[in-house]
């Protein structure tokens, strides 16, 4: 819900990038914020998982920005008009930003949960995916330690792809 209050149109990711940096600081996690505003957050393995392969959870912070024509809304400055409908989070006349806010929210929830047992984790959140993969193209691989990468940006719920280059 907090992320829906931060405008994050492609090319306008400075505020959401800072939000991620502040999250890392608040949780005493190591992080790197790249010049292109990509954010990489790392968390050590829990006891017993130190020798397991490091997992990278990857998503992007920008969102598809579409609204109803008659709606007075500015994606560069306005918080999304969200509301709860039963078990669903919805908006009034705009896209929700679940592409790919869901990856960011899931990754932050995993990082914040002190009860989960896990290997060393790297959370990679890139910029400008919706307009040309600019964040990925500017990424410094030296900033992204890991052995297994899970990209959390799928078109279908419950479907996983292995060894897929996607849009690259």
Where are these regions (language model features)?
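Acidic/His- and Gly-rich active-site-bordering loop/insert found
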Residues: 1-87
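Short Gly/Pro-enriched turn/cap motifs at secondary-structure boundaries
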Residues: 31, 162-165
């Amino acid at each position: 819900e907090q992320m829906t209050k931060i405008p994050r149109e492609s090319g306008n990711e400075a505020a959401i990038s800072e939000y991620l940096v502040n999250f890392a600081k608040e949780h005493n996690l190591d992080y790197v914020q790249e010049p292109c505003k990509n954010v990489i957050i790392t968390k050590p393995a829990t006891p017993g998982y130190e020798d397991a392969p490091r997992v990278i959870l990857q998503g992007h912070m920008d969102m598809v920005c579409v609204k109803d024509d008659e709606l007075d809304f500015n994606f560069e400055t306005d918080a999304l008009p969200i509301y709860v409908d039963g078990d669903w989070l919805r908006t009034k006349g705009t896209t929700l930003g679940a592409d790919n806010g869901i990856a960011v929210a899931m990754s932050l929830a995993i990082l914040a949960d002190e009860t989960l047992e896990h290997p060393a984790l790297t959370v990679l959140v890139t910029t400008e995916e919706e307009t040309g993969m600019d964040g990925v193209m500017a990424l410094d691989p030296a900033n992204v330690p890991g052995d297994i990468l899970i990209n959390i940006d799928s078109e279908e719920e419950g479907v996983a792809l292995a060894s897929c280059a996607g849009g690259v």
